[in-house]
Amino acid sequence: MTRLDSVERAVADIGAGKAVIVIDDEDRENEGDLIFAAEKATPELVAFMVRYTSGYLCVPLDGAVCDRLGLLPMYAVNQDKHGTAYTVTVDAKNGVGTGISASDRATTMRLLADPASVAEDFTRPGHVVPLRAKDGGVLRRPGHTEAAVDLARMAGLQPAGAICEIVSQKDEGSMAQTDELRVFADEHGLALITIADLIEWRRKHEKHIERVAEARIPTRHGEFRAIGYTSIYEDVEHVALVRGEIAGPNSDGDDVLVRVHSECLTGDVFGSRRCDCGPQLDAAMAMVAREGRGVVLYMRGHEGRGIGLLHKLQAYQLQDAGDDTVDANLKLGLPADARDYGIGAQILVDLGVRSMRLLTNNPAKRVGLDGYGLHIIERVPLPVRANAENIRYLMTKRDRMGHDLTGLDDFHESVHLPGEFGGAL
């Protein structure tokens, strides 16, 4: 196993104006980024970064800073597969030459981090790429963008970093992997940490959710405890339906059956046949009830994969005209999937969950939760109920979004798919 350094050392180095290396999850980019605080940028630091990285230097910024500086999205429809929020590129208006030199880019970085700077201090386009970090940092999105802003803030500096991916010195044309990054860190006296470690540190020292209420909820699947949460970063309320003891005198929080369910008014409440959400929620509650122990976490604010109810209805109009569920979102200028699971992960941790069997057909959901210190020991598939109204939608989820759905090609209205449930499940 690769030797890692402490988050405390990385924070101290950032505060001292040094660079650090941060590695993300192997199921995500699986890359190491060189990171330093933007306000500490010097020509020497920038030249070092350019020499050992791809050279595509970015400056992650807090959302409020982006708003103050008028940094609009680079493209209206973000199609980046990891959701990196690129904004329009910039150069400092004054004190630079062409903008590309290490000295010029250091000047632009420091200006981006300066709380006194305004939008008019920059020219657009330029040679530095600002990125908009998610509010809540790595607890909301486990990316290098958020890690850079978190590290700067934890060091007592302005919420602005500088990042770029380290390239391999052994395999030209590839990005450096973990073992090579450790050697590189030792050669240059740099701290090497992971985003997972940063998440764990923040989880131990900070809390971004609040448990507000708890009540008994009798359902047709038996009785659950409904535990309500709020988040300081979202004006949204979430509910966890809990069955049995998750963690306590007789339970250690391991091997918990968990469903993280995205809100779907049309499917969950109205019984729409355009999606499989309602039947999946019902099946999850039934499976947890039958297990006698588990959690069904109902995530509000995830309507339409995060685009909202009215946008979802607009997307339905486009689907009726021939677009699939992905293209409909993109035509509306919206991402195919805007959900994040950071708050859900914190709720599960608060409930005492340590390891889980995750009820989902969506492998991306596993990645979205796994980066938060929750150990997913198994992905448990949910049964699928296909019909003439949702078969194309299900095929799109399988073919374009990577969902693990089998039997769809053999579907016709009179035949049930493998694992389809009835009222007895």
UniProtKB/Swiss-Prot annotation:
Binding residues for Zn(2+): 264, 275, 277
InterPro entries assigned: DHBP_synth_RibB-like_a/b_dom, DHBP_synthase_RibB, GTP_cyclohydro_II, RibA, RibA-like_sf, Riboflavin_synth_RibBA
Annotated GTP binding sites: 259-263, 280, 303-305, 325, 360, 365
EC number: 4.1.99.12, 3.5.4.25
Ranges for region DHBP synthase: 1-204
Residues given in the record as Mg(2+) 2 binding sites: 29, 144
Transmembrane feature ranges: none
The organism's place on the tree of life at top rank: Bacteria
Molecular-function annotations in GO: 3,4-dihydroxy-2-butanone-4-phosphate synthase activity; GTP binding; GTP cyclohydrolase II activity; magnesium ion binding; manganese ion binding; zinc ion binding
Cofactor(s) this protein cannot do without: Mg(2+); Mn(2+); Zn(2+)
Any one Gene Ontology cellular component term annotated for this protein: cytosol
Cofactor notes: Binds 2 divalent metal cations per subunit. Magnesium or manganese. Binds 1 zinc ion per subunit.
UniProt keyword list: GTP-binding, Hydrolase, Lyase, Magnesium, Manganese, Metal-binding, Multifunctional enzyme, Nucleotide-binding, Riboflavin biosynthesis, Zinc
Chain residue ranges for the region called GTP cyclohydrolase II: 205-425
Sites where the protein binds Mg(2+) 1: 29
Residues at the catalytic site: 337 (proton acceptor), 339 (nucleophile)
Function: Catalyzes the conversion of D-ribulose 5-phosphate to formate and 3,4-dihydroxy-2-butanone 4-phosphate. Catalyzes the conversion of GTP to 2,5-diamino-6-ribosylamino-4(3H)-pyrimidinone 5'-phosphate (DARP), formate and pyrophosphate.
Xref: HAMAP family: RibA (MF_00179), RibB (MF_00180), RibBA (MF_01283)
Record family assignment: In the N-terminal section; belongs to the DHBP synthase family. In the C-terminal section; belongs to the GTP cyclohydrolase II family.
The protein, known as: Riboflavin biosynthesis protein RibBA
Organism annotation: Mycobacterium marinum (strain ATCC BAA-535 / M)
Classification of source organism: Bacteria, Bacillati, Actinomycetota, Actinomycetes, Mycobacteriales
Protein encoded by which gene: ribBA
